Curated annotation (Swiss-Prot):
Pfam families attached to this UniProt entry: Hira, WD40
Zinc recorded as keyword: no
WD repeats: 62-100, 102-140, 182-221, 230-273, 276-322, 326-367, 492-526, 528-574
Basic residues bias: start-end ranges: 426-435
Main subcellular localisation: cytoplasm
Protein's UniProt name: Histone transcription regulator slm9
A GO term from the CC aspect: HIR complex
Record bears the keyword NAD: no
Subcellular localization(s) per the UniProt record: Cytoplasm; Nucleus
Biological processes per GO annotation: chromatin remodeling; regulation of DNA-templated transcription; transcription elongation-coupled chromatin remodeling
Amino acid sequence: MHIFVPKLLENHQFSSISSSKDFVAVSAETNVYILSKDFFYPKSSEKRIIQSLNGHKTTHLSFDSPISCIRFTYDGSCLAVATEAGTFLYHSEKWDKAFQVLSGPAYEVCWSQQGHILATSWKQISIYVKDEGLRTETIVKKTEHADSNHQPAVSIEESKEAVESTSQSSEISFKLIKVIEGHHTFVGGLAFDPMGQFLASQSFDHTLKVWKLSTFGVEKSIAKPFEQMPTGNRFLRLSWSPDGAHIASVNAVNEGAYVIAIVQRDTWTYDINLVGHQGPLECATFNPYLYEDPFQKSIIASAAHDGCVSIWNTACARPMAVIHELSCSSFVDLQWSTSGFELYGVSLDGNLMLLQFEESEFGEKMDTIHYPDDLSYFNSSRSKAHVNKNAAADRTTSPTQGQPESPSKSILLRPPPSIASSPESKRRKCPKKFVARPPVPHPTSLYSQIRIGCPYLKPKLVISKSFGTLIVKNHNQLSLLKCTFSNLDGNDCSWFSYLPNAIVLANGTSVFWAVATEDSSIYIYSPAGRLLLPPVVVAATPCFLECCGDFLCCIVSTGLLYIWNIKNFEAIHSPVSTLPLFHSNFSVSKIARGPSIEQFFVTKQGHPVAIMSDGNAFAFIRDSSSWLRVSEGWWMIGSQYWGPLASESNEESPLGFLERCTDEEIIKAGRGRFLQRLVKALMLRQGYDNYEMLVSIRHLENRLMSSAKLDLEYDFRENLILYAKKIAEEGMKDKMDELCKELLGPLRIPHNGIDTVKVGNRLWSPTIAGNNKRNLLKDIIIHTAKYRDMQRITSQYSDLLRRSALL
């Protein structure tokens, strides 16, 4: 990443910035400077940038009123300048005169994806639609008999020789079609839905409203995240993700922290919060592209009053980059370039920022999204009125009875022939491209207690592994699979397969490939492309498909969990419900929204593990047919041992990974400070003197049992040593004696025995989680030797270990 921050103007406040393919426009008070992008590369000097303001390659536009916002269309063909005197529209590279001035003051301005719709805001929102008309220009020759003071009108039919040339040119204008009134004060941010269905607006009245463009009605009004919003902001510039799935709204407050509230499409929930700024936020903007390396993600840039800029990855709760001290004042606007690798920003103290990123920092771009036409929803909403209007016009213009009908009039009144009605036109029709959409709901999901959201069907899906690459291409009629791998000779080979339904998910290991389709079927292939099983039909549409080693695990939309051993062609257990994971969060007065599954995977031993949005991690143990909570946010604040374990290979331990995920989910939800205040209040009360010590011991015991049930050899050994040292330090002799007795077992069993024996009413195994119990007892005796109070107990078991070794 390259950083470039020149100070363009002294004692001038910038208010907005916008970029196109060739130009960058910045506004300062009553002036707009349109600069070539050549001046903004990091190799340019600050002196050259400042000199360019008065150079011949810079266009300077001056206005009588202060400028609050400027925006290029996405293709860079038009520039809109919002002022208190009106909105000025310019054609690109024709800066001498605005081709249209929209009356009325404007504080914010926003273009739709194709530039057919324009929205401006003050206390109300004005919607304009592009209108393209044809203007005919006729140049007439002057004859020598013509009067110099009067030029007679010459028609084409009467004198064709007098016409020099006739040309037609398109004339673009924008018509006001609707004024939306719903906010109580100024609107500080506007953002169009890339799919053309909605318009989002954020106002200083502490609300964010989503408007449906087909009816201009309120689809959703959101107020809770902005109830404690500070009032010192100049702008509230929000942004819509390139796939239309999320809205990034600024200046939300969660537990006293300034956050970016991510609003999800359709449900309009705001469970995701990006925490990282120390001051109120002015603007947030999505990168215009989605990136798929290492997984699908979108990039967000945000700026606040603290003068720093943060770059976020939506797949992670923490910012991927934070750039401090870029400006002494707050940044008021951020804009990505059309390439997606440059970020421009302006601040109130006259600084212009350029952050230039490398492709390796974001990953590979996904395929270009095919957006629908901006005006499709306007046309659909008005089609009925348009038909009625045409019918009335036909009745009024039809010829009266008894009057002759001219040929020209009959041609005008005759409806145009339908192209789609002829057989030849049907053969000429091109197949429609596959558009990303949600899967068709399975009938069983309509009556289920659980409804898990299914991933969108995408035109292309790429699964890259170290042993091969699987490429999925969905079409309207069928789906194509292409797998590339290396054979035993080291040569690259590939195989293909066609499926009759759209593919939702795909995954694989070195043992098999698995793909899940929209009709609730799972196809399993060998690495060479051989179909290992007939299609496996599950209860509903698959939502999660994970695999590891020989095991394949699937969760369907009705909440049922399936797991198979593909090598042995058998199910590990019958389908299990995930209903216990979706518990409701009860409070005194209401029932809050329940958690959702954020991550899901399966271990090498075939144990499925789910990480929830509230930070809890659950594992299903088939021996007891129950879900176990292996990690939760309660331990994060009260335990002294919260954090990852350092392994010998410098790899993160499985339990450490689960606790890190719990940490991220709690911070993402903004609950960390609440738990910290709760624990501090408890520790100050009388009778809670040993609170931290007891919570730490319970945390270690939970780790021990979790690693034992999940067969985690390294985690069990390390946590057992920590647990033994902790109870020895606290002088808990009964716990130490009980632990040593369990690890020693019956003396009649040889030291290296592997068979399970019956001791009283229970069975005793010489191993646990892949570790020999008596070897673990040796490690405990060595690590607790320095505690004098425990030597009387450990010395007895040391003698018993010597006796068992002689057997």
